[in-house]
Structure formats: structure tokens, C-alpha cells
């Protein structure tokens, strides 16, 4: 199976600024977190929704977001909800540029709360409390992707 031809079915080229071409692929979900185990668990849940996960640590994910606009982003906040803080400005810029708060962003948090209560209303659409289970996360992914 040729991955390039498969991706081409879902890819749209866009421009973020005059010097950067970005690829929009709504079938992909960027899964970001420092814990490789949590990234694998979340990626399997994403696959159950019929989507293709891209699993990366925060430093690599920042580079990926410069060239790819995924259908959604899932951030694992880690033990203190700060693991992905360096990505927030880039995600906020993507969402402002889209004009529609896209891509949707899910934060996996150790605390219960709303994006507003955590001070992330401009960047995060939904907060899902840990532990991560398919019963909690999959309906949220499905709802955000289909909005």
C-alpha cells in the first residue's frame, strides 16, 4: 500500500503565511505527550474512531504543526498539566488563522474542570479527566471531529 497516494485523498494544501505551505489532513489526529505509554493508549482510541494518529512528544509536535494541520489535537498535560505548554501559542495561532477554532483540541488532565476554569478557553475545546479510557475519550473525539 502506498502511503502517499492514500494520504493524497484527504490532503488539502493551505498557506499559513507566504513562506510556509501547510497540509490539512482531517483524517489525522496529533497525539502529544511526554509519556510514550499514554501516547500509545490514546492512539489506539483514536484508531477506534477510524482516524489516523500521529503520536509525538511535545518538542517534535511543535515542528509537525508548522507543516500539518490535523483534524484534531489531543494533548496529554502530564502530572501537572504543563507538559504541552510550549505548544499553546502555536495552536492558538492555528485556531485564529482558521477563523473557526480549528483544529479542535482535547486536553487530558489530572484535574477535573473546563477549559475556562483551567485558563485555556482560547486553545482547548474539551478537558477529559484521567484515567484515560475508551469510554471517556472516544465519544469526545467523535463529537469534535464531526462538528
Task: Give each language-model segment a name.
Residues 35-38, 76-83, 112-114, 134:
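Short acidic, S/G/P-rich loop/turn micro-motifs used as interaction or catalytic elements
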Residues 74-101:
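Conserved phosphotransfer microenvironments
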Residues 130:
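A Lys-centered signature of the CheY-like receiver
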Amino acid at each position: 500500500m502506498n502511503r502517499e497516494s492514500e494520504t493524497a485523498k484527504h490532503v488539502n494544501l493551505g498557506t499559513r503565511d507566504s513562506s510556509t505551505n501547510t497540509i490539512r489532513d482531517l483524517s489525522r489526529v496529533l497525539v502529544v505527550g511526554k509519556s510514550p505509554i499514554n501516547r500509545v493508549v490514546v492512539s489506539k482510541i483514536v484508531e477506534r474512531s477510524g482516524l489516523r494518529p500521529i503520536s509525538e512528544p511535545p518538542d517534535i509536535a511543535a515542528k509537525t504543526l508548522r507543516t500539518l494541520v490535523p483534524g484534531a489535537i489531543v494533548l496529554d498535560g502530564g502530572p501537572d498539566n504543563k507538559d504541552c505548554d510550549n505548544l499553546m501559542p502555536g495552536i492558538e495561532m492555528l485556531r485564529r488563522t482558521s477563523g473557526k477554532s480549528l483544529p479542535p483540541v482535547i486536553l487530558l488532565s489530572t484535574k477535573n474542570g473546563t477549559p475556562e476554569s483551567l485558563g485555556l478557553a482560547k486553545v482547548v475545546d474539551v478537558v477529559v479527566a484521567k484515567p484515560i479510557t475508551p469510554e471517556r475519550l472516544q465519544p469526545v473525539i467523535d463529537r469534535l471531529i464531526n462538528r
